[in-house]
């Protein structure tokens, strides 16, 4: 399972979300690779799940990335992040 976190420049926002997602996956006992990229690199990235804020997720839909897209309303709301990741993982049969 590969999860890619996407933000505009692939620096601060996506790195913060990557660390949160790694902690959430560890709590859930899910083994997955988690990386972060900028929006421009997302289309060329192979991933099962792409995670981004709502505006980034809209751009991922437009780019037609090949993977499940998880849109977050608030990048610091870990409980919402866990719920949305759980739904995506269940849909992909990883949970």
Report residues per predicted region.
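Conserved active-site segments centered on acidic
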Residues: 2-38
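Short, polar loop motifs at secondary-structure junctions
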Residues: 38-39, 54-58
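Short, structured coil segments at secondary-structure junctions
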Residues: 45-46, 63-66
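Short glycine-/acidic-enriched loop or helix-start segments at secondary-structure transitions
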Residues: 15, 60-62, 81
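N-terminal glycine-rich "phosphate-gripper" loop used for MgATP/nucleotide binding
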Residues: 51-55, 73-75
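Ser/Thr/Gly-rich flexible loops in soluble cytosolic domains mediating phosphotransfer, phosphorylation
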Residues: 68-95
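Short, hydrophobic beta-strand segments that form beta-sheet elements in well-ordered domains
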Residues: 34-35, 49-53
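Conserved hydrophobic residues forming the short capping helix/wall of the S-adenosyl-L-methionine
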Residues: 21, 25, 60, 89
